[in-house]
Each structure stands twice: as C-alpha cells, then as structure tokens.
Amino acid sequence: MYLMGCFAFICLMDKLNFPNYKFNIKKSDEDLLIFDEVRKKYIVLTPEEWVRQHLVFYLAQEKKFPQSCMKLEMQLKINTLQRRPDIVVYNNSGNPIFIAECKAPNIKITQDVFEQIAQYNLILKVPYLMVSNGLNHYYCKVNFETKSITFIEDLPIFTKET
C-alpha cells in the first residue's frame, strides 16, 4: 500500500523539464516526504519542493555546483522583512554566486517573480539568477558595472574560478 501511494503521487506530479533523477521518498502519517540531500533531512513533498529538489540535482549533476556550496531556504533580511531564497550557491571562497527562485509547476513566472529574486540580489549581489517553475527556466547574468540584467541561454558549468 505504501509503495502504491508513493507511486500514485509521483505519477500525479508534473513531469518537469529536467533530466530524470532518483529521489528518496517516503510516507509519514500524513505526508509524502522527500530526502533533501543539501539539508540532510526529509522535507514535505509539495509541488514547489518537487521543483526545488530537481533543481538541486540539476545544479549538482549537470552544472557541477557542489551540494556543499548550496544553501536552501536560508534566511535573508530585507529591510525589516525576513525572506528565504530557494537556493543560494557559494563559490569556493564563500561568496554567493547564484540565486534560484522556484515555483510550483502550476504557477506562472511573472514580473513579480523576477522582482522577488531581484530583491534578494540587492543583498547578495550574485552574478547569476535563475527562476523556474520546473517547466520553464529563465537564466540571467547580472552586470553590476552597467547595472543591467541580460537573459542567457543556460548557466555556466561551476569551476574553481566561478
């Protein structure tokens, strides 16, 4: 029954625009849980978490971003407000280089989502941004000298120089 319930839920989850990855999923009394490799604990499996976990695997496996350099839903204070960017990646020197904002697949990516991630970047000042609902991915390169943001086709591969 347990496996059947998990399988049914996964089948109902949207097929995302990412490669296929294997996840560790289990059922609690009330929820399905997915193991978060970055936070090293089980998290309630929501549609947004489904996207976030796919993106973590994508960044680690396809873009070579070390999971040890990722922070998920870290607290960030913007004026008097507490915010939580979905994923922040740091380079080997400990400087933030990338922010991702994840939305559930049924949520449209709008100007408001880009403004949300731009607010995070006022504090973190990273060169790369990504917004995704798992189906549509948008990548941006920030130029701090010209104070401009350019959409790019894809993220670079993580290197020691990144």
Residue spans for each PLM region:
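Intrinsically disordered regions, especially transient/low-confidence alpha-helical propensity segments
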Residues: 1-3, 47
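A short, conserved, highly charged catalytic patch centered on acidic carboxylates
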Residues: 13-128, 135-162
